[in-house]
């Protein structure tokens, strides 16, 4: 088997994998190769588009709950990191593939406590070195951010280093809210606090938010990434390109079709 290195840029009609084998063995692996290569190339491509739109900001893969089954969620997380994501919320993918596991708490964490401040305070005690607080459970500007600022202030007063901290928003007008949130955090003395966002993001929405001047610097992308929602199938094919003759030379083979896009490129290909 010959293949391009994972993460390589590949163009249409360019071969990704070459299999040299007896015909029966080559046929036996066809379905497995197509299943693996098509799905993970699809997700890696979508991830690359999202990361490009983020213009250097960190992108986290958040899609397991919306993936088409546990395998696609786990292997999709792997592909997303190959495509440029800095980590995944999928802890199984982290265990299997030794990739960074990232994320925040859920709204249910907040709702399980008597009040939002208590929930934030407890989370900060558990994760002082990665304290990202989800601020939109009740009201982002009137409740979430003021309570987050109180927690960050208490941490600073207690001498706890604020190495990686900030907030996440999962709803609302993200451009408007992020600007307000940035001003509130800066005014409170936390200019290096991270502003993270999620909520059905994709490359188009991230680009739009950038153009609107959003102050978001970290993106959690789930459904639209792990399903490649706008283009959910990758059209890779596995075709016979050459047959080895008795004298050791390769005889080119071509698949013809009335549909020009289904005509294959014949001949033994060289992989670099």
Model-assigned labels for residue ranges:
Residues 2, 6-191, 201-211, 225, ...:
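Buried, small/hydrophobic-residue-enriched core segments of structured protein domains
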Residues 183-188, 193, 201-272:
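Gly/Ser/Thr/Ala-enriched C-terminal appendages of enzymes
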């Amino acid at each position: 088997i010959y293949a391009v290195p994972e993460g390589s840029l590949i163009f249409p009609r360019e071969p990704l994998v070459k299999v040299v084998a007896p015909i029966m063995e080559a046929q036996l692996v066809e379905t497995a190769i197509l299943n693996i290569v098509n799905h993970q190339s699809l997700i890696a491509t979508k991830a690359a588009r999202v990361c490009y739109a983020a213009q250097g900001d960190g992108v986290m893969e958040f899609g397991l709950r919306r993936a088409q089954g546990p395998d696609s969620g786990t292997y999709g997380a792997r592909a997303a990191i190959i495509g440029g994501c800095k980590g995944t919320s999928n802890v199984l993918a982290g265990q299997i593939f030794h990739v960074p596991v990232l994320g925040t708490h859920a709204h249910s964490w907040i709702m399980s406590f008597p009040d939002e401040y208590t929930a934030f305070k407890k989370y900060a005690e558990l994760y002082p070195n990665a304290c990202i607080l989800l601020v939109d459970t009740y009201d982002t500007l009137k409740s979430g951010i003021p309570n987050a600022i109180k927690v960050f202030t208490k941490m600073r007063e207690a001498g706890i280093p604020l190495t990686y901290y900030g907030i996440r928003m999962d709803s609302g007008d993200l451009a408007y809210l992020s600007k307000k949130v940035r001003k509130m955090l800066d005014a409170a003395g936390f200019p290096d606090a991270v502003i993270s966002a999620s909520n059905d993001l994709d490359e188009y929405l991230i680009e739009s938010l950038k153009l609107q001047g959003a102050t978001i610097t970290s993106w959690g992308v789930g459904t639209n990434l792990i399903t490649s929602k706008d283009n959910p199938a990758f059209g890779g094919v596995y075709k016979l390109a050459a047959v080895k003759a008795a004298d050791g030379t390769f005889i080119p083979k071509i698949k013809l079709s009335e549909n020009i896009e289904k005509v294959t490129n014949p001949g033994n290909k060289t992989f670099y």
